[in-house]
Amino acid sequence: MKYLITFCMCIITFTAFGQIKNIDMKKEKPKNLTECIQMLDKNLKTEDKDYIKTLTEDEFFMESHFTIGMGIRNEWIRSGNPELVTFFLDQGVKHPDDMSAMILTSYYRHLLGKEIDFEGQISAHKKELEQ
């Protein structure tokens, strides 16, 4: 129960006071992970990128899930973008939340100059599904 309350408080805090603003994702529809990263890089403001760099990967994911992540799910995944959805389905990723999580994780790692390790993300996802 203590963890549930902590989790809920984090969600409320990040949603209410988060620094990363949603960006306009309606203009272009990426077809794969590389294009997603390029479009996020192009559309995020420099101050947002600088802020993201101050966060841990988990902090970025928690803060962006209901902002940028929601935009990714609504505009790139759910609103008629068969190429991107097919890209993830071919990897065994079926849920929009999981798709946006991999895009966000990959973007964060790209921004920090880390290895994206998409295959590792897919492998971890498959292990989670097996449990």
Please describe what each predicted stretch is.
Residues F7, C36-L40, M70-E75:
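Short, functional N-terminal and low-complexity linear motifs
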Residues I20-M62:
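N-terminal secretory signal peptides
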Residues D48-Y51, L55-Q131:
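Compact alpha-helical subdomains of small soluble proteins
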